[in-house]
Curated annotation (Swiss-Prot):
CDD domains tied to this protein: RfaE_like
Gene source species: Escherichia coli O157:H7
Modified residues (N6-acetyllysine): 179
Gene this protein is translated from: hldE
Subunit structure: Homodimer.
Family named by the database record: In the N-terminal section; belongs to the carbohydrate kinase PfkB family.
Region of interest called Ribokinase, as start-end residue ranges on this chain: 1-318
EC number(s) stated in the UniProt entry for this protein: 2.7.1.167, 2.7.7.70
Protein's recorded name: Bifunctional protein HldE
Length: 477
């Protein structure tokens, strides 16, 4: 199955926050100044790049989405340089000019790949009238699918609570990359995206994944958030939502050269994907893939649609993710050459719940690789009735592929996966429920090949059918 990228071209996103200009002076250094014990750098290259909230907007525009940027600047060369750089990459700027303040600028001097000094030109915009920012947000709300608030604690988001309320009143999701430990100011946001250090600065040190989930869910409740995404560097990212099982996604980075701006890429891809009409789980899947690309580049960078598609589909080359049947067979051959035990299971997995997550985690513990075969939409309809599936095949596979326990996801069109299992011949075939092993599709073929068949219990009280019934009852009530 081909994973389709979101329709970014129809996504409109506004970014509001602290914009800044990053300046870089490069050159060789071979002597010490006679005036002071400091190196002399002969500057031969000068670069200017949009930073802060401007980098978020660039990440959104690089995907082909419609990006609008609002922020505070001075009336100076830095503001003009920002406007030109952003216009060149199709970011529509609507800056509020503050004559009494300079545009925030960070100048870095580098030699031999080492940063020697950073000079900051800023006064902060605290106390500046926020009304022009509110007016720009109000004017855009009817034409955007997401609002990003990018906080670098420079003053542009001093009235962040009013901005959140404006967007929520209009039904526009609000995504915030937080700064500092006062999360009270972000109350009512749709999604916060702190990194692990920022998260632990608020909730305390977390020794286990369970503690991250427990404290994250409390934070969601305390501040009336809809969701929380904790980015965890080499450990990937964790999505927490009330009433849903936590979604832990392992990192997809192959090599890490520079984490600068990775958070901007994550929130930019999240916003663009949501604005394109995709689910939050799908948005996290694509954001995780994009982060894996951007940390492999030097400096603040963006991700193109081609790079993102290669990152998603490229997992097949490294033995992971959503695959075609042919790709899966090659991956299994490679796994067996490495001496790995292959476990396989199957199901509809329509509305993923805690029972599914627990079952798949237990299945994964039985071997080195876990294959999940998923009924196609037509197969599901024949099995479950005309009202199913609730979620289409592509969405079901993407969410499964994002789970840490799952290595490979493949679909099948038939009523049972018997043909598929016979072609893969896993070392262990697993099924959840009250089946007898001989009743499980593909069991005879696996046994004939010397493999094992095992039945695992599902977690009590978890059922897609019950979830659907509860939703229907809540609507009636």
């Amino acid at each position: 199955m081909k994973v389709t990228l979101p329709e970014f071209e129809r996504a409109g996103v506004m970014v509001v926050g602290d914009v800044m200009l990053d300046r870089y002076w490069y050159g060789p250094s071979s002597r010490i100044s006679p005036e002071a014990p400091v190196p002399v750098v002969k500057v031969n290259t000068i670069e200017e790049r949009p930073g802060g909230a401007a980098n978020v907007a660039m990440n959104i525009a690089s995907l082909g989405a419609n990006a609008r940027l609002v922020g505070l600047t001075g009336i100076d060369d830095a503001a003009r340089a920002l406007s030109k750089s952003l216009a060149d990459v199709n970011v529509k700027c609507d800056f509020v000019s503050v004559p009494t303040h300079p545009t925030i600028t960070k100048l870095r001097v580098l030699s031999r790949n080492q940063q020697l000094i950073r000079l900051d030109f800023e006064e902060g915009f605290e106390g500046v009238d926020p009304q022009p920012l509110h007016e720009r947000i109000n004017q855009a709300l009817s034409s955007i699918g997401a609002l990003v608030l990018s906080d670098y604690a420079k003053g542009a988001l001093a009235s962040v609570q009013q901005m959140i309320q404006l967007a929520r009143k209009a039904g526009v999701p609000v995504l915030i990359d937080p700064k500092g430990t006062d999360f009270e100011r972000y109350r009512g946001a749709t999604l916060l995206t702190p990194n692990l250090s920022e998260f632990e600065a608020v909730v305390g040190k977390c020794k286990t994944e369970e503690e991250i989930v427990e404290r994250g869910m409390k934070l969601i409740a305390d501040y009336e958030l809809s969701a929380l995404l904790v980015t965890r560097s080499e450990q990937g990212m964790s999505l927490l939502q009330p009433g849903k099982a936590p979604l832990h996604m392992p990192t997809q980075a192959q090599e890490v050269y520079d984490v600068t701006g990775a958070g901007d890429t994550v929130i930019g891809v999240l916003a663009a994907t949501l604005a394109a009409g995709n689910s939050l789980e799908e948005a996290c899947f694509f954001a995780n893939a994009a982060a894996g690309v951007v940390v492999g580049k030097l400096g603040t960078s963006t991700v193109s649609p081609i790079e993102l598609e290669n990152a998603v589909r490229g997992r097949a080359d490294t033995g992971f993710g959503v695959m075609t049947e042919e790709e899966l067979k090659l991956a299994v051959v490679a796994a067996r050459k490495r001496g790995e035990k292959v476990v396989m299971t199957n199901g509809v997995f329509d509305i993923l719940h805690a029972g599914h997550v627990s079952y798949l985690a237990n299945a994964r513990k039985l071997g080195d690789r876990l294959i999940v075969a998923v009924n196609s939409d037509a197969s599901t309809k024949r099995l479950k009735g005309d009202s199913r599936p609730v979620n289409p095949l592509e969405q079901r596979m993407i969410v499964l592929g994002a789970l840490e326990a799952v290595d490979w996801v493949v679909s099948f069109e038939e009523d049972t996966p018997q043909r598929l299992i016979a072609g893969i011949l896993p070392d262990l075939l697993v099924k959840g429920g009250d089946y007898k092993p001989e009743e499980i599709a593909g069991s005879k073929e696996v046994w004939a090949n010397g493999g094992e068949v095992l039945v695992l219990n599902f977690e009590d009280g978890c059922s897609t059918t019950n979830i659907i019934k509860k939703i229907q009852q809540d609507k009636k009530g």
